[in-house]
A protein has these predicted regions:
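A transmembrane-helix-recognition feature enriched in membrane-embedded lipid enzymes
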Residues: 1-57, 109-110
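Soluble catalytic domains of membrane acyltransferases
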Residues: 54-131
């Protein structure tokens, strides 16, 4: 019962923060590049996690970007994983997302603006080959 009450309180707060944050990101990226906007995204993702009651704890160190590409792969467990990876990295990164997620109104628009790459899950081998 306690978790239900906490969820009823936190989810509306999270949704408000998310919509306002995505709106702010659209405004910000009108004037600066996606790479320059990463510090805003890092802050935004931490605020979203906190407002949803999620705790981010980073163990170990994340490699610094040194003119070489990295592929970060993680076991996708929840809808907050992408917030966690952006909040935990010090540089801009491009993500991949299932193509159907682009149809969600605010979230899909945010994915497109962020530069995420759509992947068709039905054609997984072709998607892996494209990476």
């Amino acid at each position: 019962m306690y978790k239900t009450i906490v969820s009823i309180i936190l989810w509306p707060i999270f949704m408000i923060m998310f919509v306002l944050g995505v709106g702010g990101y659209f405004i910000l990226t009108t004037f600066i590049s996606l790479q320059q906007a990463h510090s805003y995204m890092k802050w935004f993702c931490r605020v979203c996690l906190f407002s949803a009651g999620q705790i981010l704890r980073i163990e170990g160190s994340i490699p610094e970007k040194e003119k070489q590409p990295y592929i970060y792969m993680f076991n996708h467990e929840s809808m907050f994983d992408h917030f966690m990876i952006v909040a935990g990295t010090s540089h801009y990164l491009t993500g991949v997302a299932a193509e159907d997620q682009y149809s969600y109104p605010v979230y899909g628009a945010g994915l497109r603006r962020y530069g995420a790459i759509p992947i068709k899950r039905e054609k997984l081998k072709a998607a892996i080959h494209s990476l």
